[in-house]
């Protein structure tokens, strides 16, 4: 995740546009608002949120991967009868359809 974030920051600094970041498999854990990294570790969740808010970049979680890993939005928690959620507002849940739309809109796909 750090490599992906660094790549995004570098791409933006060099004038490129990022239209969406799609998190899949273990990448969905970046949206978990309840992570508490040690003081000498990078807070990936906060860094992704900052990138999104500073550059208006949508952050999309694969909903299937997120649910399998216990990462829930408020809607997912309600639909699955869970009393709590842990995905922050900066991240939305979506399916592979959102990934396909992003691929169609972009001139390239970078995968980490």
Positions of predicted regions on the chain:
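Short coil/turn connectors at secondary-structure junctions
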Residues: 15-19, 55-57, 105-107
């Amino acid at each position: 995740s750090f490599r992906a974030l660094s790549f995004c920051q570098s791409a933006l600094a060099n004038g490129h546009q990022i239209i969406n970041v799609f998190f899949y498999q273990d990448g969905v854990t970046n949206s978990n608002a309840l992570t508490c990294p040690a003081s000498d570790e990078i807070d990936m969740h906060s860094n992704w949120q900052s990138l999104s808010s500073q550059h208006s970049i949508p952050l999309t979680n694969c909903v299937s991967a997120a649910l399998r890993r216990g990462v829930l939005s408020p809607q997912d928690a309600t639909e699955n009868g869970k009393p709590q959620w842990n995905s922050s507002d900066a991240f939305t849940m979506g399916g592979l359809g959102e990934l396909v739309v992003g691929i169609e809109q972009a001139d390239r796909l970078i995968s980490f």
